Curated annotation (Swiss-Prot):
Descriptive protein name: Small ribosomal subunit protein uS11
One BP term from GO: translation
Gene: rpsK
InterPro entries: Ribosomal_uS11, Ribosomal_uS11_bac-type, Ribosomal_uS11_CS, Ribosomal_uS11_sf
Organism (species): Dechloromonas aromatica (strain RCB)
Transmembrane portions of the chain: none
Lineage: superkingdom: Bacteria
Subunit composition and interactions: Part of the 30S ribosomal subunit. Interacts with proteins S7 and S18. Binds to IF-3.
Pfam families, per database record: Ribosomal_S11 (PF00411)
Family under the similarity heading: Belongs to the universal ribosomal protein uS11 family.
Length: 129
């Protein structure tokens, strides 16, 4: 059976002026996703994907590097203004916002969207080291 040549589709370049930066800062990792107003992802990066492993993945510097990577990819899509939504208690919360600001993106608002239970599940036990 003859193989048919698969068509190579060129990636459609989106041109979006303003977007939303979703920062998910957990204790172990930081995930930054930049979307358009409708929620379609334009770019994303993680501390682990930036080359950090183990305990170094959960540092503010790793979150800063990940935010720079996601921000540069979003700037290629034309994003200039960004609204920041932070979720989670992790160490990369503040440094990732500073990194986006240092890239030259205009931050219109910063909001904390960390889900807070109305006394739902019992939290994990305290760590004993």
């Amino acid at each position: 059976m003859a193989k048919t040549a698969t068509k190579v589709r060129k990636k459609v370049k989106k041109n979006v002026a303003e977007g939303i930066a979703h920062i998910h800062a957990s204790f172990n990792n930081t995930i930054i996703t930049i979307t358009d107003r409708q929620g379609n992802a334009l770019s994303w990066a993680t501390s682990g994907g930036a080359g950090f492993r183990g305990s170094r993945k959960s540092t503010p510097f790793a979150a800063q590097v990940a935010a720079e990577a996601a921000g540069k990819a979003a700037q290629e899509c034309g994003v200039k203004n960004v609204e920041v939504r932070i979720k989670g208690p992790g160490p990369g919360r503040e440094s990732s916002v500073r990194a986006l600001n240092a890239l030259g993106m205009k931050i219109t608002s910063i909001s904390d969207v960390t889900p807070v239970p109305h006394n739902g599940c019992r939290p994990p036990k305290k760590r004993r080291i």
